[in-house]
A protein has these predicted regions:
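Short, well-formed alpha-helical segments that are part of the catalytic scaffolds
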Residues: 11-26
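Active-site donor/metal-binding and catalytic loop motifs
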Residues: 209-227
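A short, conserved alpha-helix in the catalytic core of glycosyltransferases
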Residues: 162-171, 175-213
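Glycine-rich, basic loop-to-helix element that forms the pyrophosphate-binding segment
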Residues: 60-78
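A conserved acidic beta->alpha catalytic loop
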Residues: 37-46, 62, 93
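Short beta-strand-to-loop acidic/aromatic patch adjacent to the donor-nucleotide binding site
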Residues: 82-94
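Acidic/His-rich active-site region of diverse nucleotide-sugar glycosyltransferases
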Residues: 96-181
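Non-catalytic, C-terminal membrane-associated alpha-helical segments of glycosyltransferases
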Residues: 231-235, 250-302
Length: 302
C-alpha cells in the first residue's frame, strides 16, 4: 500500500493550524504527501514548508485553480510507479485515523472501482453532508445521498454509482493515467466532480462510497472573503453551462439552463432586500453568459 495524498493551498494562513492537526491523523498511512501551492506569497510558502517539512512541495507560481493544482500533483504522482493509490484531500478536511487504509482496501476490493470515497459529515458532527451523490448522466443532475440525516440512518455499507465529492477521494493511478484522464483545467474551480462523473460513466468504470470511513468537511473559510463568494457564483454559473454543452444534448442543456435561471429568479425575488443575494445572482448570471459565449479564461479575480 503506497498512497500519495495531494492537497492544494493558496495563502491559507487561517487554515494552517487546523490543517496540520488533521494531517497528523493520516500522515503515517502515506507514502508521499504532495502539497501544491497556487501562487501564494513568499511568506506563506515559507510557513508552508515549515509546517510540512517532509512533504513534496510543488509551487506553480500562479493560480491554477482547483483543477490545475490537482493535475500538477497527479502528474507528479504518476511519475512514480511505486504509487498504487492517489488521494485528493482538502486542507480543511478531517478524516478518521486509519481511514485512508480502509479506503485503499475498499478501492482494490473490486476491479471495476476507479474512485472511492467516505461518508462526509458536517463540521464536528454526526450529521451527513453527503454519502456520495446520486447522478443522472442524461441531465447532469446530482443530489447528495442522506443529506442532513444522522449517520446512524445509513443502512448500506457501500453504494456504487453516482459520484464521489472531489475534496476527499481516492483513485487508482490508471484512473487518471489511461482510463478517464486528468481533470479539465478549463473549469478552474467547481464542477470537476460532475465532469469526472460523466467521463467515468462513458469509460465504464465505477465510483463508490463506503460508510465504514468517515470524514468531516470543516469549511474553514476566510470571513472577509466577499469577493471570493461572489466569484464563486460566477464560476458556478459559467461551469454549469460549460458542462451542459460538453456532455448533454442541446435539448437537455437548454432545459437545464432554463431551470437554473428560474430558480435564481425565485431566489432573488425572495431575498431581494439582501445586497449580497443580489450580487451573488448578478455574478451567477454573468458567469452563465460567459459559459454561453465560451469564455473560460476570466479566472483572474481569484
Amino acid at each position: 500500500m503506497k498512497i500519495a495524498a495531494i492537497t492544494l493551498t493558496r495563502n491559507d494562513d487561517f487554515r494552517l493550524v487546523p490543517w496540520k492537526m488533521y494531517f497528523q491523523d493520516y500522515k503515517d498511512e502515506l507514502y508521499e504527501h504532495i502539497v501544491v501551492d497556487n501562487g501564494s506569497t513568499p511568506e506563506y510558502q515559507r510557513k508552508l514548508r515549515e509546517a510540512f517539512p517532509d512533504s513534496t512541495h510543488i509551487e506553480l507560481g500562479y493560480n491554477g485553480g482547483c483543477t490545475g493544482a490537482y493535475n500538477a500533483g497527479i502528474r507528479h504522482a504518476l511519475q512514480d510507479s511505486e504509487i498504487d493509490a492517489i488521494m485528493l484531500i482538502g486542507n480543511d478536511v478531517k478524516i478518521e485515523r486509519g481511514g485512508l487504509t480502509k479506503l485503499f482496501v475498499f478501492l482494490y476490493s473490486n476491479n471495476n472501482n476507479g474512485m472511492v470515497g467516505p461518508v462526509i459529515l458536517k463540521k464536528d458532527s454526526t450529521e451527513v453532508a453527503c454519502f456520495g451523490m446520486s447522478f443522472n448522466p442524461d441531465t447532469g443532475i446530482a443530489l447528495p445521498r442522506y443529506a442532513h440525516k444522522p449517520v446512524t440512518e445509513i443502512q448500506e455499507r457501500t453504494i456504487e454509482g453516482g459520484y464521489v465529492p472531489g475534496g476527499v477521494c481516492m483513485a487508482k493511478p490508471e484512473f487518471y493515467g489511461s482510463i478517464v484522464g486528468l481533470q479539465d483545467e478549463a473549469l478552474f474551480l467547481y464542477g470537476d466532480e460532475r465532469d469526472m462523473a460523466h467521463r467515468i460513466y462513458k469509460a465504464g468504470v465505477k465510483e463508490a462510497v463506503t460508510s465504514e470511513v468517515r470524514a468531516w468537511h470543516q469549511h474553514i473559510n476566510d470571513n472577509g472573503a466577499t469577493n471570493y463568494i461572489r466569484f464563486s457564483s460566477y464560476l458556478q454559473g459559467r461551469n454549469h453551462v460549460y458542462l451542459d454543452k460538453k456532455h448533454l444534448t442541446r435539448r437537455r442543456a437548454f432545459a437545464g439552463l432554463c431551470k437554473r435561471i428560474l430558480f435564481k429568479m425565485l431566489y432573488l425575488a425572495r431575498y431581494f432586500y439582501k445586497y449580497e443575494a443580489r450580487m451573488n445572482v448578478s455574478y451567477y448570471i454573468k458567469g452563465t453568459f460567459a459559459g454561453l459565449k465560451g469564455n473560460m479564461d476570466n479566472n483572474i479575480q481569484f
